[in-house]
């Protein structure tokens, strides 16, 4: 019996061994793979940048799903201002109060905070961004809802905080009736079409469906660039607007007249100008010839060609100018005011003043971004300098709307919001790049801010208005200013003398004439023209 039992058991054991071996093999292989995967996953996770997602709404959840598809970021938590979802778990990620961000940074070594709040107001974004400045983390954001391609969020759509976010200014929707009044079904001409403002005017004008859009530009490359861009836009949108690229100088009245008459121009936006204060200060005669007499040539050509509306793009630097550029733009305004007051004037002249536009050539923002990327220092001319800022699209839209409101000789002033202290802007840009300001209190910081001294003709503060007679219009961001003016009979004498002084390179007479005209010119520096200085060295 014992032998029989043993025999049966051994037979069963022999039959079970393959099964046992198979199970051991499966468990061994599976567990080894799981261990290896865990090791590799942990290794990959350590290589990824730990991030916090600010905003646990639909956009934040989409961003989390997008992050999981790439090996760049490792999301460790949501934070959200909504107390109803704090202390909950969404997609295996806990939602924290924003006050707990310091703890999360310390515990998980968070290096970046990703903003996923596209529907927030500009004021709300500004408040959140200012709170995040306290942490040494780079802040990135997804675009606003209107800028998202197909409404989809991806890691590639993340971008750095822009100065627009720092300004926290809510846009005012453009009024269609004002946008189209001088453009729709009309022939429109933009001088300086390849510049920062000129090119944006062209983009906005194209959307308002003129019959023709004339791009008038001195720079061949700038003209080529904007013409190419607009044609690509037209192809994508199926637009039938005729775009006409024209090379020419605004100082050539014959060229201007022939263009305006040949195309029967209805509306002119005059954006061509020399605008950089030091450059005009160093090249006084060219600045006056272009800004004053170039404007006059355009305006007179418009009158001769029967143009209905002429809008001058002016500047806040024309108010109590301390430099030649500002004085030259104020002289340009005086020219239009005088022409507008002429008897039986059929062309409606107006001018629109505003401050600095974000992203324009020479703007502090791209300069600061480049300096931060290069490790500093950020160079600033004065620690107390302030400026007004506006986005280029908003400025262009307001210029078009203001032009439609003009009755003749109007000086419009755009509401630029609050002035910005440039040193504060520089500090914010450094901190939001995940770096620290290097100064006496923080000698081991990353980026130093270096004060270089005011440039020739540069103001500490800019003004937008002259006098107190400021009147509101029907648009909340457009006002009118009451200005001193001269009738054409008096102004033409000054202009004649000014032209003679330019032709004779008489810098002293130029300055005296700018002082004699009602420009409010109070020069901050002596004569800075480089050729004049070189000649005086030789003497």
What are these regions (language model features)?
Residues 93, 98-99, 125-187, 193, ...:
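Flexible, Lys/Arg-rich cytosolic regulatory linkers and terminal tails that connect or flank
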Residues 188-204:
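N-terminal Rossmann NAD(P)H-binding glycine-rich loop of SDR-like oxidoreductase domains
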């Amino acid at each position: 019996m014992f032998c029989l039992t043993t025999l049966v058991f051994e037979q069963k054991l022999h039959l079970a061994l393959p099964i046992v071996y198979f199970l051991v093999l499966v468990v061994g292989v599976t567990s080894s793979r799981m261990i290896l995967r865990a090791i590799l996953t942990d290794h990959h996770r350590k290589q990824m940048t730990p991030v916090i997602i600010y905003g646990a709404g639909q956009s934040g959840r989409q961003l989390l799903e997008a992050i999981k598809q790439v090996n760049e970021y490792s999301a460790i938590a949501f934070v959200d201002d909504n107390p109803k979802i704090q202390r909950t778990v969404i997609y295996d990620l806990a939602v924290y109060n924003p006050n707990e961000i310091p703890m999360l940074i310390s515990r998980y070594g968070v290096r970046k905070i990703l903003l996923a709040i596209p529907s927030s107001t500009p004021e709300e974004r500004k408040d959140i961004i200012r709170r995040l400045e306290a942490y040494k983390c780079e802040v990135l954001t997804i675009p606003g809802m209107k800028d998202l391609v197909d409404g989809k969020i991806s890691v590639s759509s993340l971008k750095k905080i822009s100065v627009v976010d720092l300004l926290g200014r809510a846009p005012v929707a453009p009024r269609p009736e004002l946008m189209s009044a001088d453009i729709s079904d009309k022939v429109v001409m933009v001088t300086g079409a390849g510049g920062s403002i000129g090119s944006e005017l062209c983009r906005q004008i194209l959307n308002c469906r003129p019959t023709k859009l004339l791009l008038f530009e001195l720079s061949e490359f700038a003209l080529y660039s904007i013409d190419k861009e607009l044609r690509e836009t037209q192809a994508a949108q199926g637009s039938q607007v005729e775009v006409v690229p024209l090379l020419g100088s605004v100082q050539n009245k014959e060229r201007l007249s022939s263009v305006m008459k040949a195309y029967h121009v209805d509306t002119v936006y005059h954006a061509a100008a020399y605008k950089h204060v030091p450059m005009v200060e160093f090249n006084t005669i060219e600045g006056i010839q272009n800004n004053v007499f170039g404007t006059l040539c355009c305006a007179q050509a418009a009158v001769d060609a029967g143009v209905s509306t002429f809008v001058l793009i002016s500047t806040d630097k024309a108010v109590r100018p301390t430099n030649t550029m500002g004085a030259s733009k104020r002289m340009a305004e005086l020219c239009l005011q005088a022409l507008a007051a002429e008897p039986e004037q059929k062309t409606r002249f107006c001018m629109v003043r505003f401050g600095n536009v974000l992203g324009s050539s020479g703007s502090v923002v791209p300069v600061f971004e480049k300096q931060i990327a290069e490790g500093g220092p950020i160079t600033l001319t004065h620690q107390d300098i302030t400026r007004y800022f506006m986005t280029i699209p908003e400025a262009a839209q307001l210029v078009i709307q203001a032009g439609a409101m003009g009755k003749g000789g109007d000086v419009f002033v755009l509401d630029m919001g609050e002035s910005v202290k440039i040193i504060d802007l520089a500090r914010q840009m450094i901190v939001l790049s995940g770096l620290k300001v290097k100064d006496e209190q923080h000698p081991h910081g990353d980026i130093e801010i270096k004060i270089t001294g005011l440039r020739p003709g540069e103001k500490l503060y800019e003004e937008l208005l002259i006098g107190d007679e400021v009147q509101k219009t029907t648009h909340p961001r457009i006002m009118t200013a009451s200005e001193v003016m001269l009738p054409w009979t008096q102004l033409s004498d000054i202009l004649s003398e000014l032209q003679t002084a330019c032709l004779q390179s008489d810098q002293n007479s130029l300055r005296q004439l700018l002082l004699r005209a009602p420009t409010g010119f109070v020069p901050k520096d002596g004569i800075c023209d480089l050729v004049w200085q070189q000649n005086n060295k030789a003497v």
